[in-house]
């Protein structure tokens, strides 16, 4: 029986079905590499531009780690491709800005909702559509 040829997704350079359902993303490819070093049985799936993708297991759970570069444009392209490749839960880790003085530099922040003033998502959804995290994922974190 002949194996069906799978198309490589543009930008992230992996095929549909290559990505684990749980994905950690970050902007910096070096940070993605560092995170991947915490995984067991890790393998590099692809390195294409700012998208460096690794898969392995963490405490027996399959996890993929990928970078998406700087800015919302690269993140959106990466997230859409990750979903096509099999991602079901995407958690973005890394740095962010803040507006509350009591949240100091270096604080761990688990975001439940965000303002959508990025310049990209309004092209995909009305601004009235809320950017709210899945509460089951938030509770698990």
PLM regions with names:
Residues 2-140:
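Metabolite-binding pocket within alpha/beta catalytic cores that recognizes anionic/polar moieties
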